[in-house]
Amino acid sequence: MAIGNLGSLITFSVSSDKVLTFDGMQRNIRGRWAKHEPIGQKPKKEFLGADSRTVSLPIFLSAAHGVKPRTTLDRIADAVENGTVLPFVVGGKAVGKNKWVITGASETWDVVMKDGRLVQAKVTISLEEYV
């Protein structure tokens, strides 16, 4: 059953032969503010508008769960380095109003077999709203 997707790059799903999910997603929503400092008065704030939203998405990749960790990591790296713009959907609903770009990915290679096959890894991808 599909949980959601990050464009065609990753489909998050749970089935009898494959588990690919994220855990602990963090979404940050901020405003942009200027600070004016008049002499002899407290600083004045001025709202400039909304800032780009960001998401941090930790993902566990395991060959035991029907996922190819090395292939998935390579595809994520390509998306980062090529500036790929992607829709992000969870539960059939878009996350935010706009599409997203992956601004970075941090990988941990947990289990590498003696023949060099990566069988278990974690990756945290950093997304930023694309406007």
Locate each region found by the language model.
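Compositionally biased, intrinsically disordered low-complexity segments enriched in polar/Pro/Gly
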Residues: 1-131
